[in-house]
Structure formats: structure tokens, C-alpha cells
Amino acid sequence: MHTMNGDNFANSFPKNPLLSRNSSSSNVIQYSDEFSPDEDWLNEHAAKEHEERIRRPSVNRAWQKNSTSGGPSVSLEKREADVASLGEVMDLEEVPRGITRQARQLNEYIFPKHRFRNHLVDEGKIPLVLVACGSFSPITYLHLRMFEMATDTIQEQTNMELVAGYFSPVNDHYKKEGLAPAYHRVRMCELACERTSSWLMVDAWESLQPSYTCTARVLDHFDEEINQKRGGITLSDGTKRPCKIMLLAGGDLIASMGEPGVWSDKDLHHILGKFGCCIVERTGSDVWAFLLAHDIMFAYRGNILVIKQLIYNDISSTKVRLFIRRGMSIRYLLPNSVIQYIERYALYRDAEPVKTIFYQSPFVRMEP
């Protein structure tokens, strides 16, 4: 029976030459274009997409010009007409084949496993599950891209095999500016995963909790569902192997670990010692300088995987919300289905307190 701890994680890095994503090795997440947004918008939707693209700026700026409070002032009739137009382009409530959506009530909650890979291609490797905790208000292409960057690094630098990836949006008790209701954020994450990925899932458990839930408890929840209830991965001989569960984190989450009073030492020891963390590094920065200055993170450096961002990407949810309030285009910053959802429910139109938008950090931003 394999055990998951910092020592065997550090020993999981291979001595063999690096694997290539395009190599004959089968340790590669299989991708499908079945739910690709490009395919959704071809043929019968192409003309409507073009019409919507032309229409969008005038619609976005209409409420801005008529409002003095920063919120929408478009008439109810016009908003209903806009929603009807969007509904013709894409049915956001249509659930693609094989997809299970999350419940809105905790007593109806079921752990999502419809895309969980139940076997290892290479049984000599450690099964890995990545969990991204955050606001996702809204989810952007960078949030999705972080999982892809992690996939490359894990495949090339470790002896682990990725079997699942999860988004875990925070609940409404996490008091932060610009936080849309949890059920909206969960649904936007589901739309993003359903229509752009063949392996990512959304878990609503954290968002359904009656009070703020710390990250350490969220990771315990995944360990309970995957390893304690399911036994992990079933090998070809019928035996079970527990999955390594790691936190996939960006800038605000990790940088906050170095701020006094934000995280308890007990939680940091639990997260970094029992589970581990994948940190997405900002292009041109040195994450190890930060780890060197943090006693607890340095102590668990063998259980931390640094993911370099080879193509600079600074999309943030904060900037997306700002663009929406200013009536600017957010196309190509987040999936089309998420954009349509935001417009359908008129999200992120309310003014937010003035703050620094262009945040500088050695890490990629995960929050807000």
C-alpha cells in the first residue's frame, strides 16, 4: 500500500528523460473537442455569433451611460429581450452528455466523479488529484490554463499520474468584494469545465457549507471522498492505491500564507505536510526566494511543486469585473458560455470600492 507524504512526493521526481506530451507514453490526459466552444459556435450559430458580437458594445454601454450608480438601468423589457437573444445562441441549461451538475442544497450534494479516472495507465506511478480553491468570481481562462500548466509540469518532472482536477468555489461566508452568489459561481465553473475540458470537474461542497470553511478542511473533504470512501485507485490486481491530493494555487492564496494572522500555523502544516501544493509562478519571478523567506513553506519545500508560466498571462477576475462595470469587452478572457451567463443574470454591475487592480506578485493570481 502506497502512503502519501512529503518524503515519497520528493522521491517521485524521475531520473529518466522527460516525457513529451506528444510521445508514445500513455500517461497523458486524453482531450476531446466534443464540448469545444469553437464547435458549438460553428455552422448554425455562426451568423448569430456575428450578430451578437456587433450588438454587444451598444448593449453593454447602454446601461453605463444611463446610470449614475455604476449599476444597470436598462428597462426590464430590454433586458428580457437581451436574455432571449442570448438563449437563442446557446442553451446554458443544456447538460452535455455524461455530465453531472452539482446540487444547490447540501442535503442533495453528491461528490462529482463522472470524469474521475478509475485506473492508472502506468501503475508504477502515484495517482494525483489537483484541487483549486478560490472565489472564481468569475472563472477565467487563466484558472483553466493553470490546470494545463500543472499537467505539463507533473508529467515532465514527477512520478505522478494525474487522474482528476477539481474547482472548489468558496461559499458566501467568505466576505470579499465582487463575490457573486455561490450558486452563480458554481454554475459558471461548471459551464467553463463542461464546454472547454474533458477532465475537469466542479465540487460544490465548500460553497454549500453553512459557514466559512478553511482550505485545510476542504482538502480533508477530498481525501475523505476519494481515499476513505472510494479507496483511491483500483490497480489491475484488484488492490487499492490512495491518491495524492494537492492544492493548485495562484498568487493571492500563496502570498497570503506569508502574511501574519491570515493562516494558522496548524493549517499550513496540515496543508503542506499532508497534502502538498502546486504553485503557479509569475513569468520572470523567482518563487524560491519567497519560499526561502517563509519558515513553514521552506520546511515543506519537498512537498511543493513550482509551475513556471512560460507564456505570460495576467488575466484576473478583478480586472474582468472592472471591464464589465465599464462596459468594455471581456471576450477571449473567459469562455463564451460564462460571458453569456454573466449577461443573462446581469452579474458584476454593482460598483466596488476603489483598490489597486494591477497587483504585483511573484505568483499567478487565483483570487478574487
Swiss-Prot record:
GO CC, alphabetical: cytosol; nucleus
Pathway: Cofactor biosynthesis; NAD(+) biosynthesis; deamido-NAD(+) from nicotinate D-ribonucleotide: step 1/1; Cofactor biosynthesis; NAD(+) biosynthesis; NAD(+) from nicotinamide D-ribonucleotide: step 1/1
Ranges of Polar residues composition bias in the record: 1-14, 61-72
Binding site for ATP: 143, 318-321
Keyword Cytoplasm: yes
Any Gene Ontology biological process: NAD biosynthetic process
Chain positions covered by the region annotation Disordered: 1-25, 47-78
Key word Nucleotide-binding present: yes
Disulfide bridge positions per record: none
Alphabetical keyword list: ATP-binding, Cytoplasm, NAD, Nucleotide-binding, Nucleotidyltransferase, Nucleus, Phosphoprotein, Pyridine nucleotide biosynthesis, Transferase
Cofactor section: a divalent metal cation
Classification via SUPFAM superfamilies: Nucleotidylyl transferase
GO molecular function: ATP binding; nicotinamide-nucleotide adenylyltransferase activity; nicotinate-nucleotide adenylyltransferase activity
Phosphoserine PTM positions: 36, 75, 85
EC code(s) of this entry: 2.7.7.1, 2.7.7.18
Cellular location(s): Cytoplasm; Nucleus
Residues engaged in binding NAD(+): 135-136, 215, 250, 252, 263, 282, 313
InterPro entries, alphabetized: Cyt_trans-like, Euk_NMN_adenylyltrnsfrase, NadD/NMNAT, NMNAT_euk, Rossmann-like_a/b/a_fold
Pfam families, sorted: CTP_transf_like
Annotated catalysed reactions: beta-nicotinamide D-ribonucleotide + ATP + H(+) = diphosphate + NAD(+); nicotinate beta-D-ribonucleotide + ATP + H(+) = deamido-NAD(+) + diphosphate
Highest taxon, organism lineage: Eukaryota
Role played: Catalyzes the formation of NAD(+) from nicotinamide mononucleotide (NMN) and ATP. Can also use the deamidated form; nicotinic acid mononucleotide (NaMN) as substrate to form deamido-NAD(+) (NaAD). Key enzyme in both de novo and salvage pathways for NAD(+) biosynthesis.
Family to which the UniProt record says this protein belongs: Belongs to the eukaryotic NMN adenylyltransferase family.
Designated name of the protein: Nicotinamide/nicotinic acid mononucleotide adenylyltransferase
Source organism: Schizosaccharomyces pombe (strain 972 / ATCC 24843) (Fission yeast)
